[in-house]
Swiss-Prot record:
This is Protein translocase subunit SecA. It catalyses: ATP + H2O + cellular proteinSide 1 = ADP + phosphate + cellular proteinSide 2. The gene is secA. Zn(2+) binds at residues 846, 848, 857-858. The keyword Cytoplasm applies. GO terms for molecular function: ATP binding; metal ion binding; protein-exporting ATPase activity. It comes from Endomicrobium trichonymphae.
Amino acid sequence: MLKTILVAIFGSQNDRDIKAIQPVIEKINALEPYIKKLTDVELKEKTVEFRERLSKGETLDDVLPEAFACVREASVRTIGLRHFDVQLIGGYILHKGKIAEMKTGEGKTLVATLAAYLNALPQTGVHIVTVNDYLAKRDKEWMGVVYEKLGLTVGNVGNETKNEERRMAYNCDITYITNNEIGFDYLRDNMVIAKDDRVLRPLNYAIIDEVDSILIDEARTPLIISGACAESTDKYYISDRIVPRLKGRIITENEEIKAKYADVDLAKGYDYLIDEKNHSAVLTEQGVQKAEKMLGVKNIYDDLQSEWVHHLTQAIKAHNLYRRDIEYVVKDGKVIIVDEFTGRLMPGRRWSDGLHQSIEVKENLKIADENQTLATITFQNFFRMYKKIAGMTGTATTESEEFWEIYKLGVIEVPTNNPMIRKDYHDVIYRTEREKDNAVVNEIESLWKKGQPVLVGTRSIEKSEKISTMLRIKGIPHQVLNAKYHELEAQIIAGAGTKSAVTIATNMAGRGTDILLGAGDAVQNEEVKKSGGLHIIGTERHESRRIDNQLRGRSGRQGDPGSSKFFLSMEDELMRLFGSDKMSVIMQKLGLKENEDIQHLWISKAVENAQKKVEGMNFDIRKRLIDFDNVMNKQREAVYKLRNEILEGQDITDTIKDMISESIEEKITAWAVGKYTEEWDWASIDVWLLRTFGIKYETGNKDEISNLSRESARSAISGKVFEAYEHRKEQLTPELMLNMQRIVLLQMIDSSWRDHLYELDQLRHDIGFRAYAQKDPKVEYQKESFALFESMMNRVRDNTIEYIFKVQIDAKLQKMAIQTTNSDFRKNDGKKINKGSNKIGRNDQCPCGSGKKFKKCCGA
């Protein structure tokens, strides 16, 4: 109550933020008459002037008013669009590294030109990131002429863009790109052997279109570059045959709570339990015993048989949680994932941890190879590497807490240019899905007859096809949009506002394309407005309020009339899993007849509360994901930093010598144990020296060293080894030796990092079981992943040393080394890597990701 009174008196924080920007907008508007008088040449020369001012110490904020005024004028002269004041506000918010929430149709694409131009002036690159290739290409072609009018270069990177073209596009002042393409380019850049194969510049500033979709919806799925992993597929087939013979039970949250208070064992009489809400499966004690008997093993949880638990659990999930034509489709003999947020097919994407293979077996398809991760990163950690990011979307307020907590991005809601007059009706709820579907079709028929356009949003391809079939039976013409082709998708969605148009779309198919009433025809536009504008029908509530708001937002753009209504049933997934028991009881007590519905604010509120509950759960999942990925991120940064130093052509001789000294120290410490030298393990030292460095001691030499102290012995061995190193250098020539070292070290880093990622995958899969031992899985993961990382770095060191002394330089390697010498080393004047040792100093930050010093964390 107090908060409401304070807002009424002082305005909301958002109102105050907008008010604070107004003086800047007034400055921009005051400059408009002056900028209008400039010739095209003078307008273009403004860019040169701004860059000179920046070089003399002015800031981007200093040149912002004039720069924005120039962009506005360039837009008028090229594409005939003048930025409204609210769009200038949006551009200012983007420049300040925040999220501008702008309703559908408010011109977000045009808004981006303001901040993009300003931040491109320092010539460090601006990326405008969007969700698909079609939008990236369309926006580059549409807005590119504005930038070119001002003397900037513009590029676009798509799925088919070749390497050299990518490099050129990224070297442009402004680059239009999808989130997937730039993420994969970053990973690929950190896998190359030659510096010239990299395509990206350092990450400077990104404007993320549909920022909620990229930073939240897709945050649970990491980008992964993978390769085939040789593994037997027998266990998938055996597990698939066992699961149908097991008895399972799907449990709801309410059942779980009631069972807990009543002390009832839900697992009794069942072999496995399915938690549909959390998308998880677990074998019961009875199920474990039955599975062990069928498999003929004593204990499926011991080290040798533990993979059986994993394979059986994945098979259970494949049979119970993943449904054909909802979570995936089968096309051309392949299982193709359906994006749960957009309904789009995602060819080439695969579920990990063997789940995809389990589904392939379930569908009697040829099983594909298990994938091994070669490089991976989450969008959370990727976009946090930019110096500055900003975002645009029509729906960000509901996720403002997450944007701030994960990305430190504030959200400011930009006022609409014209008042919003769309009417949003209360939800209507039916007992069964059948009754709800009938009501949806009847509503469509009624609106179609009066000429009002209708956009029907569904959550799955299956649901789209079901509604489509019912409309065909009634003879109602319509378009079905299952989001398979982005360009076709845009064309269909653009026509969804024409008279009597009926369009069925999965979730946010066609997002990014405006729906114009009458499709731009003035006469038809008036007719459609008189009929009530575009009517939105939601056939089910999504887990996230934001997705529902996105659907609603397709109607009522730029002050147009419109309306929206959601149709629900007690059989909908959200209601079934998260709806309260009270709602079910009320529905029963009301004694509703066939096809009767309830409409009430209380019901809409109950649904919203259920959605808030799911949003909270999903937020926790994403936070857990980033907690674990932060551990890997510190290690990834360390490895990629070393890789880049090597690629930059810096002299790594000191690094190699440090590795050799470290290795000698480690071996002497391990084998020179005992008070007397006679007690030392000379046999192991001999074998190691011969195997690694090709050094063979004669008996006399050994006797001589045996009489020395440990320090003297270490010094003597080091002398022999470095003598052999210098001899190796003379054999090859210093230039060839230098570049052979670089090539070998890169290959050792890559192969060891690949193995390390596999080990981390396994660790992460198993770490959850530590909770049963009253241990925090996150803390355990930090400690063990650090131990694995240190072990990996030791492997890199030992393998690199051995290869340097043993590798045979064939013609191909020699040519490669010489080319590297000419192109890299001489260009960089033989700079040395500032690196003393592979070991972590006690006062260094711990690579586990805790943020603590090593001595206070894993090194304690």
